[in-house]
Amino acid sequence: EPRFAEFFSVAPDGALSRQIREAISQTLRSSPLVYEYKGNKRFKILRDCITFKPKSSTYVPLSYSTSRMDGRLPSAFCADEVGALPTSYAIEAMKSGQLNILNKLGFIISTKYPTIDNPFEDEVAYAKKVLDGIAEDDTLFALLYEPDDTKDWMTDDLVMRQSNPVSLEIPEIWDDLKKKRAYAIAVESARENFLTKHCNIIYQGQGTETFIDTADV
C-alpha cells in the first residue's frame, strides 16, 4: 500500500464497527512478528483509530451515517452485518471513494435477516448473477453459504451443514447447532434467530411458517 493509505470499517452502528477495530487490535497484539520489528512497535493503537507508523496509514471504524461517509478514500473497507443496514449508502460511499485507488478492496459480510429488502440481499443477488454468468465481473469473489433446500430444516442436517461449513471440521460447533435447532423446533419464538443467523434462511416471522425463496422474488 502507498503511504497515507486509509482503511475503514462500516456497520449498522458505531459499537459494531468498533468491534471490528477491537478484533484487529487483538490480532495485532497477538502477532509479535507483525506488531513489532527489531524491538519497535510498528502500530499505534488508539480508541478511534489504528496507525501503521512506517507508512502513516490509518484504519478508522466509522459510525453509521446516512450522509457523512462521502469524501473518504479507502484503500480497503470492511462492511459488517450489511443485512441490518437501512440503505446501501454506506457501501456506495465506500465504493465511490475508491474510484482513483489502485488495488482497491472491499469486504461485505453478513448473515441473513428476516426481510429480503436490505443491502446485503442486493449484493448476494449480484454475486449470484456473476456466478451464473449473467453478469461479468472478474474482480468479485463471493463465499455464499446457503442451504439448497430450506423446507426440511427441522430434520435435514444438510441445511445446517451447507450454511455452516466450519461445523464439518469442528464437532463442538456441530453439537451446538443441533441443540439450537432442537430449541428452535420446540420454541417458536426462537425460530427467526436460528433460521436467519445459523441457517441463512430468510424467515418471515413467528406464526407464519413462511420461507422466502430468493429465486422467486
Regions found by a protein language model. Give the residues of each.
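Walker A/P-loop NTP-binding motif
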Residues: 1-2
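Walker B catalytic acidic pair
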Residues: 80-84
